[in-house]
């Protein structure tokens, strides 16, 4: 994943200053970028990599037999892999999470509690692991129609655009029949737009539709 991604970026002519790796699956991106560099330049390259760990579950932390990796990588790649990706619990294993943490300047977990768990799980990196709670960017996540409706009732919400936390005041409108009706109308209009994008699926906006979209992984 990481190697192919880096080659694709190069083939497309992109010049990227900062690479953000989500999970260790993509950690080989650093190897691809570093394999032709001097030792000093390899260390400098770490400044351009950030890593986000999303889960403590084993499926999110790839481990491969060192012998198997040696068979598919050239000498320069494998030497870097051994240096930065050694598994602290098994000398015969390459650990892609360790590779990511050893080669990225910035490392973070996705919640305060997850940060605590990750620091315990990877104690050798304890002092470097920060926590950034997952969330949404309010002004791009809320549709234009709903945003306009919220603006209309902002006298109750209290300035939601400047302080999104004020959206909790929407509970003050739960018994407002006009607001509830307008919110439902906005929701239906958004649903029609979505159905038009998915017209080949023949989804009807007036039919209740349940969707399930997750990655294909055993623990999901």
Where are these regions (language model features)?
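Catalytic cores of carbohydrate-active enzymes across secretory and cytosolic contexts
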Residues: 1-220
């Amino acid at each position: 994943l990481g190697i192919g991604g880096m080659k694709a970026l190069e083939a497309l002519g992109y010049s990227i200053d900062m690479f953000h790796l989500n999970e260790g699956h993509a950690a080989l991106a650093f190897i691809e970028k570093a394999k032709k560099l001097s030792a000093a330049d390899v260390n400098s390259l770490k400044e351009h990599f950030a890593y986000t760990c999303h889960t403590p579950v084993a499926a999110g932390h790839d481990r491969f037999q060192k012998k198997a990796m040696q068979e598919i990588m050239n000498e320069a790649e494998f030497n870097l892999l051994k240096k930065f990706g050694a598994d602290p619990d098994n000398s015969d294993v390459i650990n892609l999470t360790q590779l990511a943490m050893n080669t990225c300047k910035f490392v973070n977990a996705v919640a305060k509690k997850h940060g605590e768990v990750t620091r315990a799980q990877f104690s050798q990196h304890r002092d470097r692991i920060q926590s950034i709670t997952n969330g949404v960017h309010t002004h791009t996540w809320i549709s234009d129609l709903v945003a306009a409706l919220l603006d209309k009732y902002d006298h109750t919400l209290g300035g939601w655009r400047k302080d999104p936390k004020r959206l909790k005041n929407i509970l003050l409108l739960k018994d407002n029949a006009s607001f509830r009706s307008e919110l439902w109308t906005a929701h239906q209009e958004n649903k029609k737009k979505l159905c038009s994008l998915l017209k080949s699926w023949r989804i009807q906006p007036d039919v209740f539709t349940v969707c399930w979209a997750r990655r294909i992984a055993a623990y999901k």
